[in-house]
């Protein structure tokens, strides 16, 4: 009996020890962190901004989007960071002085070559335009690691100001993507076209309030779906684009090509000392938008037009050379044909659309040098020529045929810009910028019939030569986070 009691006591002691060990283990589990040592559920840091796969931005975009606040979220204790948010933005303001002077020369001759009137020369000058302009931008990139690969979005929101009044915030970029493999990415949304040449005067300059000349090679931002491939320094992409243009001809509020699509592609190489790209774009047009319509030529004069526009296409290339941290050179060239359009270099919006076909080519370059760790300077030069097809206008609906025939417009632009920028820290830049460009065009129009209600008779010919010089100087400051 004594030995049995001793055995039971030993069993109770062992059981008690096991219960105490279990209690200690449970207590340690309750006090243990939910993630391994050295990790946090939410980490906030400063670093390089996330670059979206397949978004082949310009040199200017790479500089603008260089730094950001990085937010990393860990979903579980045994998994790497599942969601990363890159949050960056800036505000800039500038005192801008701008002006221009232009000269019109108008000549008229009748069918026999006799001068109808003394050559008319009209000169105007506007050199006292002072403004304080400002802009705010917020860029957010969010990525999540999923079972099928990385999925993410990019949102870039802007607001522009020039005096009193609130800004209409607009989306410069709204993009989503799926990295199906480390090399292959499928994306879509609203962004710049792959057909844009992201080098040269327009693609590589800092240009906070310069780059106003028509020497860029941007077909205009648009909604699209894109498939891209990247491996090491080599990348390529192809996209299906919407070819619609909204805003109409001469701002009449109509739209064109609303039921048409386009395609764009790009091949790019990016190395430490050398980079380059070859890009192309083709956008279909709706012939009905260019062969049956009217355009307001003056307050009391409306003409119908009939243009032979088959589609928009452009092929171009860009080259970049880097001399370490000392200097860089960026070159761009392109050739194309299609409807006459002009694009806002800041927003990517097509601001001018005319019902006439034009062919164009151009070349530009930008050189940049680091004068010190905090100071860099740049200078750019650009040239672009446009040649429009001849145009016919039916001014009098009671007469068959076209009473006015235009020879087309020979349109050239020369531009030069420069800037010097002081950046003592990543969050601050102060710069002095300047730009000058000259635009020249010449055209002639001949009457093929007498036009009722005017002094114009068949055979009369009117020629126009126009030259405009434009300049701007600004002191700009940029604050970033």
Functional labels for PLM-detected ranges:
Residues 129-133, 166-168, 216-219, 257-259, ...:
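Short sequence motifs at beta-strands and strand-loop junctions characteristic
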Residues 260, 265-417:
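Detector for outer-membrane/organellar transmembrane beta-barrel domains
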Residues 68-247, 257-275, 320-324:
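Outer membrane beta-barrel
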Residues 89-97, 153-159, 188-192, 238-242, ...:
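Transmembrane beta-barrel strands of outer-membrane/channel proteins
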Residues 138-140, 174-176, 225-227, 265, ...:
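Membrane-embedded beta-strands of outer-membrane beta-barrel proteins
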Residues 95-103, 146, 161-163, 194-198, ...:
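Gram-negative outer-membrane beta-barrel proteins
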């Amino acid at each position: 009996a004594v030995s049995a009691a001793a055995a039971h006591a030993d069993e109770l002691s062992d059981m008690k020890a096991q219960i105490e060990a279990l209690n200690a283990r449970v207590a340690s589990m309750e006090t243990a962190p939910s993630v391994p040592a050295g990790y946090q559920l939410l980490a906030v840091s400063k670093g390089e901004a996330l670059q979206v796969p397949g978004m082949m931005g310009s040199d200017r975009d790479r500089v603008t989007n260089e730094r950001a606040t990085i937010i990393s979220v860990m979903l579980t204790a045994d998994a790497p960071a599942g969601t990363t948010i890159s949050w960056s933005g800036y505000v800039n303001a500038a005192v801008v002085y701008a002006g221009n002077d232009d000269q019109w020369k108008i000549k008229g001759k009748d069918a026999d070559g006799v001068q109808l009137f003394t050559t008319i020369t009209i000169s105007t000058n506007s050199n006292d335009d002072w403004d304080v302009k400002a802009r705010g931008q917020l860029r957010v990139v969010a990525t999540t690691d999923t079972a099928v690969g990385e999925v993410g979005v990019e949102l870039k929101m802007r607001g522009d100001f020039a005096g009193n009044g609130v800004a209409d915030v607009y989306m410069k970029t709204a993009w989503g993507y799926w990295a199906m493999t480390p090399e292959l990415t499928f994306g879509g949304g609203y962004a710049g076209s792959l057909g844009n040449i992201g080098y040269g005067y327009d693609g590589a300059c800092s240009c906070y309030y310069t780059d106003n000349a028509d020497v860029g090679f941007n077909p205009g931002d648009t909604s699209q779906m894109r498939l891209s491939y990247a491996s090491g320094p080599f990348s390529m992409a192809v996209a299906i684009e919407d070819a619609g243009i909204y805003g109409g001809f001469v701002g009449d509020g109509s739209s064109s090509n609303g039921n048409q699509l386009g395609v764009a592609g790009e091949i790019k190489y990016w190395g430490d000392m050398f980079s380059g790209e070859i890009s192309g774009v083709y956008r279909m047009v709706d012939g009905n938008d260019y062969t049956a319509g009217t355009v307001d030529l003056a307050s009391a004069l409306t003409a119908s037009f009939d243009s032979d526009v088959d589609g928009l296409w452009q092929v171009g290339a860009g080259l970049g050379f880097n001399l370490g941290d000392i200097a860089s050179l960026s070159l761009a060239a392109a050739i194309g044909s299609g409807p006459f359009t002009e694009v806002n270099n800041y927003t990517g919006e097509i601001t001018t659309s005319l019902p006439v076909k034009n062919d164009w080519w151009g070349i530009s370059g930008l050189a940049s040098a680091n004068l010190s760790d905090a100071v860099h300077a740049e200078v750019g030069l650009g040239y672009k020529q446009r040649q429009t097809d001849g145009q016919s206008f039916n001014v009098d609906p009671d007469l068959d045929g076209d009473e006015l025939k235009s020879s087309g417009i020979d349109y050239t632009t020369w531009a030069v810009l420069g800037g010097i920028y002081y950046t003592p820290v990543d969050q601050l830049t102060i710069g002095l910028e300047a730009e000058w460009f000259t635009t020249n065009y010449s055209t002639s129009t001949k009457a093929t019939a007498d036009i009722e209600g005017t002094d114009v008779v068949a055979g009369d010919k009117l020629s126009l030569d126009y030259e405009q010089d434009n300049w701007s100087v600004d002191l700009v400051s940029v604050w970033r986070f």
